[in-house]
Amino acid sequence: MGAQIAGKPELFDELVRAMANDDRIAVDRADDRITVTAKGVAAHAAHPADGVNALGILAEVLGKCQNLCENDRAIFGRISALLADCNGAALGVPLADPAFGALTAANGVVRTESGKLSLSFDVRFGCSVTCDDVLAKIEQHTSDAWQAQNIRATDGFLLDPDGETAKKILHVYRTVSGNKEAEPFLMGGCTYARHLKNAYSVGTVAWYKCKSPVLPKGHGGAHQSDEFLCIDAFLEAIKILTATMIECGENA
């Protein structure tokens, strides 16, 4: 992610000093334009703490630049404050769900349009509160500098983990994998299973069969440009899914 600034030599020199020991960010100058580039680490929106937000790096550095005007520093400071954590506290929603745990808030997009700056957040909050509850708290917390708007909302989804179908799925997994101690888990992924009455979402790979290549952090994961699938683990998952359909189909 990059930012272009019309700046004086003093600003460039200040930025160079500020970035001297940080290889995540670089600065370049051409004529009267200064370009600041930050490199983050990609992560799934359900697990933002696994990544590094490039905008957060930029905002933290630029918000402290004394050679930027006071208004610009204030804007970057407000951005930095919003991106201070991934658990919702910076947005005024430090909430936790009994089943899913702490809320997550992932900033994925920043843009300027018609002279106004906007940041988009993917907020995932489980089943104990509603979208309206979350939005109201964000509005109250940020109203001094920002206008909060809900673009798209989906309430949490959870089926009974102790239901008969869940027990059958777990029984099959334990039998095929040989792991008698395996337990189901919940995650913040937005599954299509929510659109069906009695659909439990399960994985598409059996990780115990996966021999993952060693990749740098931020590579190879879900939805990333270099996402990979372990064939052996995928074929093992087909066995599990087939056995699950047979098990759940009996006496249905």
Task: Give the location of each predicted region.
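Zn-dependent metallopeptidase/amidohydrolase metal-coordination segment
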Residues: 172, 179-251
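Generic non-transmembrane alpha-helical segments
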Residues: 14-23, 57-68, 137-146, 164, ...
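A generic structural signal for short coil/turn motifs at secondary-structure boundaries
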Residues: 44-48, 156-160, 211
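Midchain, well-structured core segments that form catalytic/ion-binding scaffolds
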Residues: 1-128
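Generic structural signal for well-ordered, non-membrane alpha-helical segments
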Residues: 8, 51-55, 100, 127, ...
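A short small-residue
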Residues: 36-44, 147-152, 217-225
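Substrate-recognition/cap regions that form aromatic- and gly/pro-loop-enriched pockets
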Residues: 112-189
